[in-house]
Amino acid sequence: ESGGESVLAGIRMARDDVKKGNGKLYITQTDETPFKLGKNIATAPGEVVFRNDLIELIQYKPPGEQTYARPLLIFPPWINKFYILDLREENSMIRWLLDKGLSVFVVSWRSADEVTCDYTWNDYVKKGVYAAVEATLQATGQKGLNAVGYCIGGTLLSSALGHMAATGDDRIKSVTFFASQ
C-alpha cells in the first residue's frame, strides 16, 4: 500500500538505531523529539484565570454552545504537571470532558520555593483547594461545582471536604477520586 515507503522508513530507523548505539543496535522505544507545551503535549486551549503563591488555576472552555452550568474542578497531584490529563490529543481526558460540554478547571501546583517550602497541609487546603474553589465559582458565576481529586490531590481534597462538611460549606456538589488514599 505504501509503495515500499514503510520498508524504507524501517531501514532508516534501523540505521539511526545503530548510530545511536555506536555500532550496536540500540532500539528506540519512544519518540525522542522534545515535547513542546501546546504543540505536541497539553494541547487543549486553556488560560490562567487565578494565581497565588501556591497554585495557578487554568480554565478550559467547551468548544460548543451546549454546556453544563456546573463546572468541574480537577486537583491533580503536585508531583505531576497540570497537563497529566492532557498528554496527547488522541486520549486527552480534558478534551473529552470539553467535548461533553463541561467547563473544566485544573489546578497547576507551583514548584516549591523559598516562599512555599514551609507550607503545611492546612496551607495547601486553604491556598490550594479553597482558593481554587472560590476562583472557579467567581469565574463561572455558579454557586457549586463538581470536583475530581487525583492521587495526593485527591487526598488533599478529601481533607478539605471533611472540614467543609464540619463547617456547613456545601459548594462542592460531587467528587470523584482517581488513585487516591
Regions found by a protein language model. Name each.
Residues 149-153:
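Gly/Ala-rich beta-loop-alpha elbow adjacent to hydrolase catalytic centers
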Residues 134, 154-155, 178:
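Acidic/histidine-rich catalytic neighborhood
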Residues 116-140:
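Alpha/beta-hydrolase active-site loop
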Residues 157-161:
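Short helix immediately C-terminal to the catalytic nucleophile in hydrolase catalytic domains
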Residues 13, 17-113:
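Short, surface-exposed "cap/lid" segments of acyl-processing enzymes
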Residues 64-67, 96-104, 135-144, 163-174:
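Secondary-structure transition/capping motifs at alpha-helix termini
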Residues 175-181:
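Active-site nucleophile loop of the alpha/beta-hydrolase fold
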Residues 1-4, 8:
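Extended, charge-enriched "interface" segments that sit outside catalytic cores
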